[in-house]
Amino acid sequence: MSLSHLYREGEGAIDEEEDEMENFEITDWDLQNEFNPNRQRHWQTKEEATYGVWAERELEDERPSFGGKRSRDFSAPVNFISAGLKKAADEADEEDSDEEEKPIKQEDFPKDFGPKKLKTGGNFKPSQKGFVGGAKSFTDFGSWERHTKGIGQKLLQKMGYVPGKGLGKNAQGIINPIEAKQRKGKGAVGAYGSERTTQSVQDFPVVDSEEEAEEEFQKELSQWRKDPSGGKKKPKYSYKTVEELKAKGRIGKKLSAPQKELSQVKVIDMTGREQKVYYSYSQISHKHNIPEDGLQQQQLPLPGKDAKPQAFALPELEHNLQLLIDITEQEIIQNDRQLQYERDMVVNLSHELEKMSEVLSHEETVITNLSKVLEMVEECERRMQPDCSDPLTLDECARIFETLQEKYYEEYRMSDRVDLAVAIVYPLMKDYFKDWDPLKDCTYGTGIIAKWKSLLENDQILSHGGQDLAADAFHRLIWEMWMPFVRNIVTQWQPRNCDPMVDFLDSWVHIIPVWILDNILDQLIFPKLQKEVENWNPLTDTVPIHSWIHPWLPLMQSRLEPLYSPIRNKLSSALQKWHPSDSSAKLILQPWKDVFTPGSWEAFMVKNIVPKLGMCLNELIINPHQQHMDAFYWVIDWEGMISVSSLVGLLEKHFFPKWLQVLCSWLSNSPNYEEITKWYLGWKSMFSDQVLAHPSIKDKFNEALDIMNRAVSSNVGAYMQPGARENIAYLTHTERRKDFQYEAMQERREAENMAQRGIGMAASSVPMNFKDLIQTKAEEHNIVFMPVIGKRHEGKQLYTFGRIVVYIDRGVVFVQGEKTWVPTSLQSLIDMAK
């Protein structure tokens, strides 16, 4: 009698078709698990021993299992299983028996694949309701559509479905329904081979990888059985190559690196179970390492179904072997690192060798060049000796310095050229200029000095004593060797003979340094000119002052402004007894018109010339029958010297009242209108177009025309000359047409000027600020407006407006007064600048 009913797993061998009946015959599973101590047991309860098969089952019976046993559904109808399926199950048993005959090794067992989890094909229970009554064919599927019109078919046809083609926009759907293949027996999926249909094989061809996976699965599936041959598991070895160790580095726990012996330091080790005290760090490195792997191996496996007894275990030996392996791996890694370090060191040393070779080559080149430079300097020193038969000249010395600069530039730049120039060039330069007279030969030595300028200038050199020289070699050369000659000739020079000195400085202005030229003009030339201006008397001196002052304007420019005030004072004194009939005053004053500022010139004219001209016009007698024009010519000759407004004021005050009075008296005495017309046109032709364009002058001549028209229209006198009225009317029309044309032409010119300025200002269409407004006004009045470089007041930039120094702060212009800065208006600023 079999006791298989005591095992819950054995229920898979009971015939599932028999209602609540248990077979007591011995099955294959009973034979295979007869000597298996780890098989799962089901101990019979007291209730089962008493009632047997009529005992109530516990809830664990309802749990799913690999046996396929399920609780019966007694409410379902009785179904009968066809005999054909039984035959298929027998065939599956034969296949399983064939697989059991194959020897299975123990090492091929899966890790978590035990005998309790896999059963034979006959033990797998299919669904109670599956395949009952046999599988139905899909041939007559939807046969009712032959006699009826289904709503599904109609909807599909409305959406574009064509019978016989696939669904979808491009008819990409399948045409035939998915075929199903009936499984032969009651085994699991894949127990009877491939279950793929012909349609599946066509649509999805079988690849080799699936066949390999199937073979692998069958191989692992058969490993649940016990190895009948009783063979032992073959040990597996893991090999590591040197390349793997180099690539992955240290594998496993790191070994403590050797440390240097430190001084006696108390170290408390609390890493273990007990606190330990060490007196150096080296003792920690010598501490015994507990074999962790060994401890794990010493732990006994937990009792259970998968536990295997270990017959032979030596954890100490395994730890020592593992330690030797770790040490060997560490040595391999250390040796690889040392080898890589040595290779890197070789590469580094090779680079350093190349670099040192380059440095050595450069130093050799420098030594060679310095040797050649030293030879050239020694040669110059030898030729400068007094008893030398071939003395060194200044031109030859310049060529030697050119060679040093072109071929040995680095050595020449690093050398102390100031000392070299002082030792070699200065004696030669002094000997070169010893007989030179600058006023007689002003261009002597300009070529050789210009050459030395390119050789010695623009270098600030530190002397051997470490003191910073204020000037370079060329500046020192000019100051010490050239300036003494200039000082000597300036002390003997007469300022009224200015041409030789001006020519001399013009020849040297582009060669000598700027600060030396400023020193000559400020310290030597200007004091001589100032002293000569003080001694000048415009009444007695026959040489005009502008003849020896104006030639200095290109060189000195604004430096001469302090001389202008005493010159104006002396001229004012000389003009006190002057009469306009003396034309020499105009010859003396005319050269100064463009030198003085417009404001100072106009003030000088108004004070000294305009009153004299007014007196001359007062003395003018207007007589149409016998006119003397000398006084009028004396006044008109000053038109370019005095402003138009001043001249118009003189004419309005001293000329036109008398002229209109004479016209009225002439018209009241039976005049000849032709003579009056000629007289009118004659006086008008005496004035220039600029004067005639002035509105006041136009008004005076128009007033004369009105007087003439009134005289003609009022029939003054007993006799009227024929055509006089027409002539006067024609004259009036002609004159006014000329005035109109002149005004139109002036407006057109102003429009063109505005257009030109508009084109120039089109690019800068941004709103003008106060500074731009001042700049515009300065351009309109020909006043120089520019910033003073490097000068500020309270952080504000200083500007020069003519001769006035100003600064702008928040839209207000401030002018420098005697003690403080005073705010002023723009018009006042323009008046002060003039």
Swiss-Prot record:
A Pfam family that the UniProt record links to this protein: TIP_N
Residues modified as Phosphoserine: 2, 97, 143, 209
Positions of region (Required for interaction with DHX15): 1-50
GO process annotations (BP): biomineral tissue development; spliceosomal complex disassembly
GO annotation, cellular component aspect: cytoplasm; spliceosomal complex; U2-type post-mRNA release spliceosomal complex
Family annotation (InterPro entries): G_patch_dom, GCFC_dom, STIP/TFIP11_N, TFP11, TFP11/STIP/Ntr1
Residue spans of biased composition, Acidic residues class: 91-101
Biased composition (Basic and acidic residues): 1-11, 102-115
Function: Involved in pre-mRNA splicing, specifically in spliceosome disassembly during late-stage splicing events. Intron turnover seems to proceed through reactions in two lariat-intron associated complexes termed Intron Large (IL) and Intron Small (IS). In cooperation with DHX15 seems to mediate the transition of the U2, U5 and U6 snRNP-containing IL complex to the snRNP-free IS complex leading to efficient debranching and turnover of excised introns. May play a role in the differentiation of ameloblasts and odontoblasts or in the forming of the enamel extracellular matrix.
Cell location: Cytoplasm; Nucleus
Assembly, per entry: Identified in the spliceosome C complex. Found in the Intron Large (IL) complex, a post-mRNA release spliceosomal complex containing the excised intron, U2, U5 and U6 snRNPs, and splicing factors. Interacts with TUFT1. Interacts with DHX15; indicative for a recruitment of DHX15 to the IL complex. Interacts with GCFC2.
GO molecular function, one term: nucleic acid binding
Region feature Disordered, mapped onto this chain: 1-20, 85-132, 182-206
Sequence segments annotated as region (Required for nuclear speckle localization): 707-731
Entry's family note: Belongs to the TFP11/STIP family.
Source organism, top-level taxon: Eukaryota
Residue span, G-patch domain: 148-194
Short sequence motif Nuclear localization signal: positions: 697-702
Protein name (record): Tuftelin-interacting protein 11
Key words, A-Z: Biomineralization, Cytoplasm, mRNA processing, mRNA splicing, Nucleus, Phosphoprotein, Spliceosome
